[in-house]
Every structure is written in structure tokens, then in C-alpha cells.
């Protein structure tokens, strides 16, 4: 009996003095890689028994890991907050917070054709020239991809040139576009995208396009401004009316929408806003909430990464009590 008590006492001492390492899994947009690397370091410094593991992908692909593949994540961070209410709520999420903003630019290198001529007013004319190759991510996987399509279609309205989308996209891909009687446009992204590879460079998400651009595989890339800054790329800034970074232009943006035909999902062009949530099927929701709380407490991380923070963040839905004091309910 004494021996048994000693064994039990010894075992209890080991359990009391040890902490089990927990894994905090995050699915996030590729354009959030830089700020979330910093958030990971901050969180692990404050929580020594937690290993933060991040998976970067296009935001739509991130959501589908949860909704279609039933994978577990403690935090979902999207480059387009709207994929949360439109693809996850109410079954997979019941709240989200809007945390930062961005805009689209056209990145290039010193080897890009006509880089000494291109600007925010003539870029589409440069793209039409022989031998120029431009890249964008897949609309079916990545908000940056469908935002690129929106920008090119909006350009027809802004520059008063009805040939821009036709010559840059319709002539080189299997996308379609419908012009409605009210002057709005609906782009149709097919389930299986094909492109003219002599003119268009396509990859799943925008960060997959950076290496090939820097290796001079093509000339120009539609990319988030923050990502271009983080990677030291040269870029052309687009007018506010088409760069999707200006709240004041929201009404103009709304003239263009895109349908992802393989997903039965439609998105209207809106200002670029990033969103976070903790999925309902997360194995440890408190763990995810604690990470979101860190993000909300440190908006300067977004600012340092070139992504203007929304401070305080805007909360929508059944925001957890632990976060309510850090957000403005929208």
C-alpha cells in the first residue's frame, strides 16, 4: 500500500508540473503572411505551451478546407471579409471582425517590358502590346484573383474604353461577362479556367506569383499593395475609382460583380477589407478567441506591414464577450 501511494504521489507530481503543448491552427490568406508571422511570434512568446501553425492559401480555398474538407482551424483570416458571411455563416461561423484594409497595384521588375512608360493611366494600353505578359491569381481560389477581374472590368467604365476587358481577358481566357440593362456587369469565372499562356500567367493565389515575377517569367502582376511593399517590388498605383481601396468609391465599385460558377457564389466589388473569425467546428474555440484578441490588441502589426488597420475593428454577429470591448459593432 505504501508503495502504491508513493507511485500515485510521484505520478501526480509529474502531471502537476508539466504543461501539454497545444497546437493553434490558422488558415489565412497569403497576403497576411507577413503580419501573421509577427502575430505568431507574439502569441508564442506569451503562451509558451502553444505552437502556432499557419497555412497560407487563397481565402476561398481556406474556407473550403473547413466547409468542404471538414478540417479543423482555430482561426480563419480572409483577404475578403465577405467570404465569411457568404460561405461560412450560419453553419460554420456566427461572427467576424473586420481588421484591416488594402488596395490593388500592378507590380513589375526592371526587366518588365515598357516599364519606363507604364503608369496609372496607360497600363491597359501597355498590356495590349505584343509580347507583354501579365499575371493574376485564380478567382476560384483567391479574392485577389476575382478582384483583378473586377478592376479590369471597372477600368472600362473609368477610362471610357469598352475594349479593355474584351482584349485583356475575354480574348485570352474562357471567362465570360454579361452587361446588364442598368449598366452593371457580371463576370463569370468558369469552374475550370483556361488561359492563353503566351499572354496570361495564372496561379492559385497571389503569393505564388511573386517568385516567377522576380525570375522574369512574365512582366506585370496584379497584387495587394502591402505584399508589393513587403517584397520590395516596384509598382504602378491605380486610380482610387478602380483600385478597390477607397471607401468613397464604393458605389462605383458596385457596378461590377463576379460569379464563381463552380461554387455557386457571387461577389460584388467592394473596398478591400480583411476579416477574422473562429470557426464553429474549432476543437478549442477559446484558443482561437485568444489569438484574435491578440490581433485586436495590436493593430500596429498591420500598420507596419503596410495594411492600414481598422481601429477599433468592426464586429458583426455573435462576437464573443472576450472581444466585445475591443470592437465597434457594425
Swiss-Prot record:
| UniProt xrefs under InterPro entries | ABC_trnspt_W-bd_WtpA, ModA/WtpA
**Where does the signal peptide begin and end?**
1-13
Name the UniProt key words of this record, in alphabetical order. Answer: Signal
Q: Does the keyword DNA-binding apply?
A: no
Which terms in the Gene Ontology molecular function aspect does this entry carry?
molybdate ion binding; tungstate binding
Gene3D superfamilies referenced in this protein's UniProt entry, alphabetically: Periplasmic binding protein-like II
| Gene Ontology BP terms | molybdate ion transport
| A Pfam cross-reference name | SBP_bac_11
List the SUPFAM superfamilies.
Answer: Periplasmic binding protein-like II
Q: Which family does it belong to?
A: Belongs to the bacterial solute-binding protein 1 family. WtpA subfamily.
Q: What is this protein called?
A: Uncharacterized solute-binding protein Mevan_0954
- Natural source organism: Methanococcus vannielii (strain ATCC 35089 / DSM 1224 / JCM 13029 / OCM 148 / SB)
Amino acid at each position: 500500500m505504501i508503495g502504491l501511494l508513493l507511485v500515485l504521489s510521484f505520478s501526480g507530481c509529474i502531471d502537476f508540473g508539466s504543461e501539454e503543448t497545444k497546437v493553434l491552427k490558422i488558415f489565412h490568406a497569403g497576403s497576411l503572411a507577413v503580419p501573421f508571422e509577427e502575430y505568431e511570434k507574439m502569441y508564442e512568446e506569451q503562451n509558451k505551451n502553444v505552437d502556432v501553425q499557419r497555412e497560407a492559401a487563397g481565402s476561398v480555398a481556406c474556407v473550403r478546407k473547413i466547409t468542404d474538407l471538414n478540417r479543423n482551424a482555430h482561426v480563419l483570416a480572409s483577404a475578403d471579409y465577405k467570404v465569411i458571411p457568404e460561405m461560412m455563416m450560419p453553419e460554420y461561423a456566427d461572427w467576424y471582425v473586420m481588421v484591416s484594409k488594402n488596395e490593388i497595384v500592378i507590380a513589375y521588375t526592371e526587366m518588365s517590358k515598357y516599364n519606363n512608360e507604364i503608369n496609372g493611366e496607360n497600363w491597359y494600353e501597355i498590356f495590349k502590346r505584343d509580347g507583354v505578359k501579365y499575371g493574376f491569381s485564380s478567382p476560384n481560389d483567391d479574392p485577389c484573383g476575382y478582384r483583378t477581374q473586377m478592376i479590369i472590368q471597372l477600368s472600362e467604365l473609368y477610362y471610357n474604353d469598352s475594349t479593355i476587358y474584351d482584349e485583356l481577358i475575354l480574348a485570352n481566357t474562357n471567362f465570360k461577362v454579361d452587361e446588364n440593362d442598368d449598366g452593371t456587369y457580371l463576370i463569370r469565372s468558369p469552374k475550370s479556367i483556361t488561359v492563353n499562356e503566351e499572354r496570361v500567367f495564372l496561379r492559385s493565389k497571389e503569393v505564388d506569383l511573386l517568385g516567377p515575377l522576380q525570375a522574369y517569367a512574365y512582366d506585370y502582376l496584379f497584387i495587394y499593395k502591402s505584399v508589393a511593399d513587403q517584397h520590395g517590388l516596384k509598382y504602378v498605383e491605380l486610380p482610387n475609382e478602380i483600385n478597390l481601396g477607397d471607401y468613397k468609391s464604393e458605389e462605383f465599385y458596385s457596378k461590377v460583380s463576379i460569379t464563381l460558377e463552380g461554387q455557386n457564389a457571387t461577389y460584388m466589388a467592394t473596398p478591400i477589407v480583411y476579416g477574422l473569425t473562429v470557426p464553429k467546428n474549432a476543437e478549442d474555440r477559446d484558443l482561437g478567441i485568444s489569438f484574435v484578441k491578440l490581433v485586436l490588441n495590436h493593430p500596429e502589426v498591420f500598420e507596419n506591414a503596410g495594411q492600414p488597420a481598422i481601429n477599433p475593428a468592426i464586429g458583426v454577429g455573435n462576437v464573443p464577450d472576450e472581444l466585445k470591448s475591443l470592437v465597434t459593432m457594425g
